[in-house]
């Protein structure tokens, strides 16, 4: 079965047409993020041409703003009038809050009681009402669903939604605009909305593009589902890639991923830290753990070199919302192992 046939099979979930419509819908809101070449990853590590897609420079510091703005922009006037609600402790919260502010919609964000103060304040700064409820995300989500039902508010899901996936897929269109002959694209994965959208965009134009998902060894529900060919949960511990800390992937995103993604790479916590440090040190890029996953996969040597050598490769830096205390810890840890670390990016 060809990939073109498969993209038709998954079109009922999200299609190239949906992504092209999203591109027009969110153009007034988003920033077209830069694509820069990493000379070190290209010349010294892969012998290919490796480019970094900098979604850490997106408004709110994350790709999540794309999907949130597309979803909210497609709501009916009645839905907008009743307000929107989301459960999130991170990037999705800020994407929803900023979009609501720009469109003049009331937004409520329910966060776990343990949500970092910095993220609470950032979300409030965009004008959203923040409610702290629940000792874990599941409790937070359940409370959010109760509030939505009681008040008739529309839930904005962080990944398992057609419009959200389409919004994230606009990154794929930008990649093709910049490098029409791209061969390999490496994407961080949590719930799967990002890679589902990007894979749909890329494979619709060129089925031979090799798409690699990257997850932490500690949390990789989508990778587990992909290889077992069944929706599966996986979480053995927390991860520094907290933006991808999703135990069970989305049902819709999984359906797209299982058809359009080619493989998954799992990286260790230490490999993620190394990538964060190297991106800061050599490329002057501040990234959160999730945003460093693709670079970690390249530096780890776990990707078959046939997808890298003499190839045009894009590694997505998905976001840069990282606490300064975590940045400090990564730098300190990096200095402690400097004698044995050889990876640099630039």
Curated annotation (Swiss-Prot):
Protein role: Catalyzes the anaerobic formation of alpha-ketobutyrate and ammonia from threonine in a two-step reaction. The first step involved a dehydration of threonine and a production of enamine intermediates (aminocrotonate), which tautomerizes to its imine form (iminobutyrate). Both intermediates are unstable and short-lived. The second step is the nonenzymatic hydrolysis of the enamine/imine intermediates to form 2-ketobutyrate and free ammonia. In the low water environment of the cell, the second step is accelerated by RidA.
Gene Ontology MF: a single term: pyridoxal phosphate binding
Enzyme class, first EC level, given as a word: lyase
Enzyme Commission code(s) on record: 4.3.1.19
InterPro entries to which the protein is assigned, alphabetical: Ser/Thr_Dehydratase, Ser/Thr_deHydtase_PyrdxlP-BS, Thr_deHydtase_catblc, TrpB-like_PALP, TrpB-like_PALP_sf
Reactions listed under catalytic activity: L-threonine = 2-oxobutanoate + NH4(+)
Name of the protein: L-threonine dehydratase catabolic TdcB
Record PTM N6-(pyridoxal phosphate)lysine, positions in chain: 64
Quaternary context: In the native structure, TdcB is in a dimeric form, whereas in the TdcB-AMP complex, it exists in a tetrameric form (dimer of dimers).
Pathway terms, separated by semicolons: Amino-acid degradation; L-threonine degradation via propanoate pathway; propanoate from L-threonine: step 1/4
Regulation: Each protein molecule can bind up to four molecules of AMP, which act as an allosteric activator to the enzyme.
Keyword Nucleotide-binding applies: yes
Cofactor(s) the record lists: pyridoxal 5'-phosphate
Recorded family membership: Belongs to the serine/threonine dehydratase family.
Alphabetic keyword roster: Allosteric enzyme, Lyase, Nucleotide-binding, Pyridoxal phosphate
